[in-house]
Amino acid sequence: MNWEPSSLKTKSLPYSRQFIDEEDIEAVARALQSDWLTTGPQVEEFEKRFATDVNADYAIACSSGTAALHLLYLANNIGTGDSVIIPTMTFLATANAVRYSGAEVIFSDVDPDTGLMNASHFKDAINRSTNKKVKAICAVHLNGQCVDLSSFCEEIDKMIVFEDACHSLGAFRWSKSGQKFRVGSCSLSKATMFSTHAVKAITTGEGGIITTNDENLASRLKKLRSHGVVRDKDLGNNELINL
């Protein structure tokens, strides 16, 4: 890449310039005037529309992108004694969420031109971790660029695959056969997480969302995000937190 000053455009793209119009303000006002300030019908509508937009079966909203990552690791029983491979080029939360869960972080190198982890970097990380219990990989799609998970070696079939798409809402990739896949459709992963922080493509101020096609995982994530609270008059016990 050419980083000489003469090659850079004089007008840069704005960072953290969220666009809030009257329609947004009216929607927030309606929520404040309703009986639900959290986990209500507007959250459910947001989840349904988000899942539809990225072609996933389920979407689970939560308080932040970091919380989304943490929930994913907890819901998949990743913890002490496990390791998770992540790229070196990412926001710190990608690594911190692994540590919050008690697991160990294994860093993978990235392509210097794209900042993305590729198949050779992944294989190198695996070879450096033969004495580790590598349970998952979290591939980071950076600045709208997509990691090509389909090119990864067969070792990926032996672990849980997550996608961190905090920087890539609206991005898509093409398969070798020419088929188009939205990031978040989870065509090659168990789940994808997004952030709706103020600097992201869409914002809720703070927020995160997970997409998946796994019904059991979606149910578990919804329970974990609310301390196991389930609105069901017929449910007398909670197996998730052993009550």
Placement of each model-derived feature along the sequence:
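N-terminal "arm"/small-domain region of PLP-dependent enzymes with the aminotransferase-like
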Residues: M1-L37, P41
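Active-site phosphate/pyrophosphate- and oxyanion-stabilizing loops and adjacent acidic/basic residues
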Residues: K48, S150, F181
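Phosphate-binding glycine-rich loop
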Residues: W36-S83, A97-S101, F107-D109
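Short glycine/proline-enriched coil/turn segments at helix->beta-strand junctions
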Residues: Q33, N55-A56, E155-M159
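Active-site region of PLP-dependent enzymes
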Residues: H167-F181, L188-L243
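PLP-dependent aminotransferase-like
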Residues: L74, I78-L142, C146-I156, I160-K176
